[in-house]
Every structure is written in structure tokens, then in C-alpha cells.
Amino acid sequence: DVAVHLDHGLTLETVKKALELGFTSVMLDASRDPFEENIKKTKEVVKLAAEYGATVEAELGLVGGSEDGKSDHGIQCTNPQDARIFCEQTDVDALAVAIGNAHGDYPVAPTLEFGVLEEIRDITGKPLVLHGGS
């Protein structure tokens, strides 16, 4: 099997188009939205993806760095309790978290908070995704 994943989709319309094209996994990146809005949008994506038999990744917390020509070095670690609530309310298949990781090039090596990662793993039971790991 081959998985085709939409990473960092910015609108529900983009996610829907990807699903219509046969993507097997999608991500609506609502991580910059307020917590409740992220939950609301992600729930919509989970419901839509289920109609296509696709999996859903969501992002919680802010992963800084530079990607697609945009630069933002503001990293906010994912709060483990927020991750628990988010996963319970959305039923996402995988959760991208921020533990000090950053997209793209960074002038100083990031400090990863592995304790936070372990706590999120233990409290959610979901597969976790780390963006900016290379």
C-alpha cells in the first residue's frame, strides 16, 4: 500500500479536494487558531475524511521555523492536558505536537522537551508526529 498525505492543508476546501483526488491521509493545520476553533475545524475534517476512508492528522501547539518561504521562530510546546482534551473531542488518528521542534533551517539547534512528548503519548494514546525533525 502507498499512503498519499496532504500536509498543512489550510482550508477545509483544500482538504476536501485532496480527498476527492484520492489522498489517503489529510491534515488541516488549524494550530494557529484558538484552541476551540482548532477542535471545531478538526472535527469537521475527521467527519469528512471518514466518508473517504482516510486518516486525519492534526497539529496542536506552534512549531516554529521556516517553511514555504515563511519564517516564524515562535515555538509553543503543546500542553499535555490540551492534547488529551483535543484528542478526546476530535478523535484524530495522529497528532502533530510541538516540543521545541522547528520547520526548515534554524540557526541554533532546538532543545527538545522529551518529557512533554512522553506525557502527551501517555495521556492521549495517539500516534504522535514531529514536524521539522530533519
Regions found by a protein language model. Name each.
Residues A3, H8-P127:
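Alpha/beta enzyme core
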Residues G132-S134:
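Short acidic/histidine-rich active-site segments
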